[in-house]
Amino acid sequence: PSSYLKFSAEGFYKKYDQYPMSLVDSIPLASKGTDYGVLGNEAVNSTATGRAYGLELTGRWYNYKGLTFIASYTYVRSEFKDGRGSGKYIPSAWDNRHLFTFSGTYALPKNWDIGAKLRVVGGAPYTPYDVEKSSLVEAWDASGSLYYDYSRFNSERLKPFTQLDIRIDKTFYLKKFMLGAYIDIQNILNSKYKEQDVYIKTGKILNPDAPLDQQRYELKPVERRTGTLLPSIGLMIEF
């Protein structure tokens, strides 16, 4: 539209073929992400297929009256075919769908600059735990951890996450060098990323008089949140 304002749009499509498929639960390893213990001696074959596609829109404003910014929105789908006979595509662990980023700086008088970066990430899919199976004493003792309910693989979705970072710079131009000082505050809103809750074994058996194959541990839910406000200051010298 002008010399300082630019827009662009890009689409993409990628097809995956002959990816490892678990013979234990008939789920493609590539769709499990990093939380499912996909490394090891699990039996697999190369029959999984998938796809990733989407659209990215970008706007750039170049140094007009001291303001520069880049904003982008991405819609992305990442899916693999269900290997359990349905033939339907199911979301992979990377299927966040909506991604928005904005970063901008504004030049103030007397060599001051202020900048901001905003990120909004859509919630990733996840697989619920099979709490009923996990609470069985024999099942928990066999694995030492929770079991996923693969019949509901990636059927739930985490909440979106938003993070705002702020930075203020001051530059001093001296005779023989340039001195820059800055204050940077990451996650100034102190946003918390809500992860999938887990359950821990308390050690208490709820029904100790029942047959061993029916005994259950008491499991306690534990909420998981990450993210903290992180301020920092710094100096930069250029000769």
Report residues per predicted region:
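Residues on the lipid-exposed face of transmembrane beta-strands in outer-membrane beta-barrel proteins
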Residues: 1, 55-61, 71, 102-106, ...
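Membrane-embedded beta-barrel scaffold of Gram-negative outer-membrane proteins
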Residues: 1-40
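Residues that define the transmembrane beta-barrel architecture of outer-membrane proteins
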Residues: 1-3, 49-53, 96-100, 160-164, ...
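Repeated loop/turn-to-beta-strand initiation elements of outer-membrane beta-barrel proteins
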Residues: 4-7, 66-69, 111-114, 175-179
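Gram-negative outer-membrane beta-barrel transporters
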Residues: 12-15, 34-128
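Outer-membrane beta-barrel translocator domains and adjoining extracellular loop/strand segments
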Residues: 20-26, 33, 76, 80-88, ...
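Flexible, solvent-exposed coil segments and beta strand-coil junctions
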Residues: 31-40, 76-85, 141-150, 210-216
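C-terminal beta-signal and adjacent terminal beta-strands/loops
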Residues: 119-143, 159-163, 170-239
